[in-house]
Amino acid sequence: MRINHLFLIVAALATLSMTSCTSPMEKRTNQAIQQVMDEFQAVGVSAAVVKDGQIIYNQSFGYKDLATQTPLSNDDMMRIASISKSFTATSLMQLVEKGIISLDDDVSDLIGFQIRNPHHPDVPITLRMVLSHTASIRDKENYSTLDNLNPAVGGDCADSYYEYKPGEGYNYSNMGINLAGAILENMSGVRFDQYVQDSVIKPLGLHGGHNLDAIDTTKIACIYHRSNDQYVESNAYASVTHRLPDYVMGYSAPMFSPTGGVKISARDLATYMMMHMNYGELNGVRIISEESAKTMQTPVWMAQNSNEEQYGLCLWEFIDFIKDEKYNTPGNYLVGHTGNAYGLYSVMIWSPQDKWGIVAMTNGITHIKVKEFRQTIVNAIYKACIKE
């Protein structure tokens, strides 16, 4: 389905009903988001803002489905892409707390076959390295299978690794987090998607998950990419039911995309974010210990002059993301993650010190400015909803 961007002009009509019975803060934030939508020709945007342990703002704009002109609602879910990595790490920290695994275990012992960088065959690759993208594991064309890391299938797998010594460099690795998902499955004895559902999503009272067949698909928002100045629906969602008969426990977890497969609404993602803001606990439900939460939020890899390369365990420490000098000094950095896949752009970011956080996601924008969208919308929401 191809939709010309001029069709999106009427998306503004979907926000008219928001202008009555709203507070000054809500009106400012609605207007700020609408301006960003107009600038980026967004199909739809859903956002939520947290302050002092409460969701103080939640609104959706534009369209869930362009073909049917269905408005996007606060209940609608999108595939949030790489923010999903934090769900995988959170789940693994539960196994660490139970003493089933350690962050410094050799992942070869956790997955059941040898994981070694052939350039450094004597250097163990640890789970901490994998979760912090310092394991030297390279993304190849296909990271939806572990075959590229398995010597029994891929030989020495040399082209699946960078040449630097594991632990001494940083390269973002989707393959690495898919490996981590398989480790979760192998060491827990529970299928990856079910473990995250039962141990993180359900205890927090959230809707969504990795498995499309286990969630309410009427709440799924279409995702669009740009092609020839038109919006084209992406193949962002796929059932895996027909593949399950061939599923191998402890190996096939990438089928559910531990690296990017969570489907969730902005409101529920903000609730999940509050758990991390509160160091592992929300409303009397503890998901991980305070120590585990702080470990996830503490950078393992630190690089200068970068806004996305101070990385903990599947969480970034952001520098220069917010245009406010307060949050660009040591001790005041922001924490969170971003996502990007199929035309979806998402961000989850919070201030540990000042107890506010922002979640925003879009199901399609103009390709010309994709790198600017997340920072632009977060700054717009921050100025309208938090700073003023």
Model-predicted regions and their roles:
Residues M1-L8:
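Bacterial N-terminal signal peptides that target proteins for export
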